[in-house]
Amino acid sequence: MHTLIKGVLEEILEAEVIIEYPKDREHGHYATPIAFNLAKVFKKSPLAIAEELALKIGSHEKTQGFFDRVVACKGYINFTLSLDFLERFTQKALELKEQFGSQVKSERSQKIFLEFVSANPTGPLHIGHARGAVFGDSLAKIARFLGHEVLCEYYVNDMGSQIRLLGVSVWLAYKEHVLKESVTYPEVFYKGEYIIEIAKKAHNDLEPSLFKENEETIIEVLSDYAKDLMLLEIKGNLDALDIHFDSYASEKEVFKHKDAVFDRLEKANALYEKDSKTWLKSSLYQDESDRVLIKEDKSYTYLAGDIVYHDEKFQQNYTKYINIWGADHHGYIARVKASLEFLGYDSSKLEVLLAQMVRLLKDNEPYKMSKRAGNFILIKDVIDDVGKDALRFIFLSKRLDTHLEFDVNTLKKQDSSNPIYYIHYANSRIHTMLEKSPFSKEEILQTPLKNLNAEEKYLLFSALSLPKAVESSFEEYGLQKMCEYAKTLASEFHRFYNAGKILDTPKAKELLKICLMVSLSLTNAFKLLGIEIKTKISSKD
């Protein structure tokens, strides 16, 4: 609907047209500020240009049947859609059902490589990981809905110092809690009951002879053993959020190709030796300084592994590569992009989205940390507390790059202060009316819309605006727009529902048709957010 009108206006005016939603619904369904852009060109006031263009658009043969009104107002051109136009789109939307709001694959379709979560398999997933996980999963759902091809990958950091530290931590816990020895822990190690759990499980699972080997062998085996257990638990946590990856890439496997990548960097004159280290000339590509890839002891830095991994990704020739990282990884963006340029790739194809911090409250107090994980709030604990759907909604309700703070008790309330409940409640009200209605769904669908007032038309317009919300959410990586859309539509429906009777009116079938349209849009919006909308819900209002 939005796209059609924009295209027709651009054809008539032979200029790019921006379509907006008026702040005041009394001004119509759409507005354009094009007169302000043309004022300098024609050396006339925006008001005069708007009046001329409004007349031209309203009388043009290509817009016949589109609008009830096209008027100039303070330099803007405002459009009120006709009921015939709205009905045409309503009929098409209701026929499309779960595909309403989507697009078929076209020449504009992209091939997208989406990497997210990628938490080190050294501990359970905590609430900080969950935000990026939910965002990435919903972004993939929306991209696929819009006809794009998406591969979702989890990059498993299964080598290096952190994995060894995991093995050391489990070995020390084994000695203390299984062998009952006195242990001196290092300054840095993995804490939490989960480490003790792994140590005790290792005692039952692994051959007793292992623990008679030299300490380095024991640590190496325990590192792999603990890593595999943690990855299994991480996958279980993701399952609980209904998040599933197409691929899990092992850093250990990917890094086997490091020599070929470093040879190419060498040939590109991207490396140099200094202080017995190998450096990347990343400062040539807007990085703050050059970066070490190989340390004095000939071990590789974390960045070296990232470079090899991104080389493997870019060899697969996707249209776009999206990484979702924690905000603390901001400094890595320039250095990774620099390596891509040295390797001969177009680094602009890589987009890195940063997930900001999450602060959870309960009864206005900081949420209790997990004893099992040490100083973290586990995803599993919060899912058990408020449910998967509520958690997904709240994580998507704010821009990914802004800090998020919320009280989980809000998500347990059964009133309008709980946004996800109020959206479920709107859909529940619709289904209750449909059950009470003497009309079949087929009768309602075949009913022409002839007698709607301005408020009813606006509710229908809002329900039909889902495609624009979907498109904007993807193009701007602003998934909060989907949450805002669902909240606004639910709020408008509740206002409509509370304004008067629906079933006991001569135009009951017309109003129920609007309700079907609202339910369809809420259902499809929630599906893209990874939430199953409810058709039955209790209320304490």
From Swiss-Prot:
Keywords: Aminoacyl-tRNA synthetase, ATP-binding, Cytoplasm, Ligase, Nucleotide-binding, Protein biosynthesis
Keyword Membrane in record: no
Any GO CC annotation of this UniProt entry: cytoplasm
EC number: 6.1.1.19
Keyword flag Ribonucleoprotein: no
Catalytic reactions of this protein: tRNA(Arg) + L-arginine + ATP = L-arginyl-tRNA(Arg) + AMP + diphosphate
Enzyme class: ligase
Alphabetized HAMAP family for the sequence: Arg_tRNA_synth (MF_00123)
Membership in a protein family: Belongs to the class-I aminoacyl-tRNA synthetase family.
Entries under NCBIfam families matching the protein: argS
Protein name: Arginine--tRNA ligase
Organism expressing this protein natively: Helicobacter pylori (strain J99 / ATCC 700824) (Campylobacter pylori J99)
